[in-house]
Amino acid sequence: MNRILIVHTSWYEKHIAKMLDISVGILEKSYKCDKAKAPGAIELSALAKNKLEKNNYVGVLFLGIIIRGETSHYDLVSTETFRSIGTLADQHHNIALINNVICVENHPQLKERLVINTQNNTNALIQL
């Protein structure tokens, strides 16, 4: 059975657990899912790169949440996270990589987007 790597952050555990349940529920019908937890969003691509070098995966799904705070930290984290995942995708063009790191202004936006974004992005991974 082909393997999918799901790399997720350690922040917002309750929400990440829901994202994992949704993704695994969709993927496990056709794939074996391996999970790896990164300390934060910026570390997602480094962890995935390490796992890709040691294992044979047909796809990687990134799960994370970045919520704007009162400082510019949000801008730095979201920009660097998306840049590093994009760079990894360029380096591994033969593997399907989907970024489901959800960037929001607040918790109501997260609640509004979490389920549908996770479902859509997990299904997009299958289509690649």
Report each predicted region and the residues it spans:
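A charged, well-structured terminal subsegment
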Residues: V115-L128
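Structural motif
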Residues: L5, V58-V60, I95-V101
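Short, acidic/small-residue loops that bind anionic groups at enzyme active sites
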Residues: V77-C103, K111
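Short, ordered loop/turn segments at secondary-structure junctions
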Residues: S10-W11, I65-I66, V101-E105
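Glycine-rich phosphate/diphosphate-binding loop of Rossmann-like nucleotide-binding domains
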Residues: N2-K35
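Glycine-rich phosphate-binding loop
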Residues: L47-I85
